Amino acid sequence: MSQIPTMTLGPVLYLWEGEKWRDFYFRIADEAPVTQVFLGETVCSKRFHFTEPHLAEVIERLENAGKQIVLSTLALVTLERESRHVRGLIADSPYPVEANDLSALGMLRGTPHVIGPMVNVYNAATARLLASRGATAICLPPELPVESVNRIVADTPDVEFEVFAFGRMPLAISARCAHARSKGNIKDNCQFVCKDDPDGLAVKTLDQQSFLALNGVQTVSHTCQSLLGELHDLAQAGVSRFRLSPQDCDMVAVARIYDDVLTGRCDADDGIAQMQRIYPGVPLSNGFHHGREGAAWVARARNTAHGANL
């Protein structure tokens, strides 16, 4: 590992009131040890008007704090106005763009850009193809097992790889809005009910066990992926960036814990214990990383004589 990897902050996936969204990023700018911040609505174009009035001042605050800015595209484009928005974003943005939908790739060809975690990069051949078209960094999908991550990174030189290290995992997106339907509304008259669930709406089994969460037209995991115990192994394998996906909790504290573990100021086990206090009520998981079901938690085995991970 030639240098300590950096941390990035992904776009807010949920619908927050504009002032809350603005103040969240103001605090990130002033206090969070992240080097790069992704901004933009990736889930539902109907949410644009909540955040766009605050975007310029958020960017200014982040840039004044030395943060790098990347603008993220929608993850599903179904309407002409959404297509126009993506085209305009790519044509006019003074910042790098993160593609979260294949429809953006043709417009980005030949321009340095980032591939987001909602684009299915499942092998090195795909990563190399994207790199040949201008991708300089790729955030791998959170469902990839570590063996696949290692192989893709090893077989794709000259690309920065990012791993989804914290947050509820984006699993699916639809043209229909199950969140609105769950509240008795339709998508065209949703009344923005997803705003009432700033961390997602729990979906339960018949046995009343939470197993997914709704976020407008998006489905995310009930559990929160946390790769604190895997950071150093991933860094040794060549992963250069770790993405923190905003949840409705103290994300500055989350970023500090990850920074402390990465730099060796804190043991991963202590970091996990702190994380559970910061984000209570949502189970942590790392199952996908270990080739298990995504909701599983695989505890680290320790060599008690040497304190090494097994």
Where are these regions (language model features)?
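Active-site pocket-lining/capping segments in soluble small-molecule metabolic enzymes
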Residues: M1-V121, C139-L140, V146-L310
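Residues lining hydrophobic/aromatic ligand-binding pockets adjacent to catalytic sites
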Residues: A135
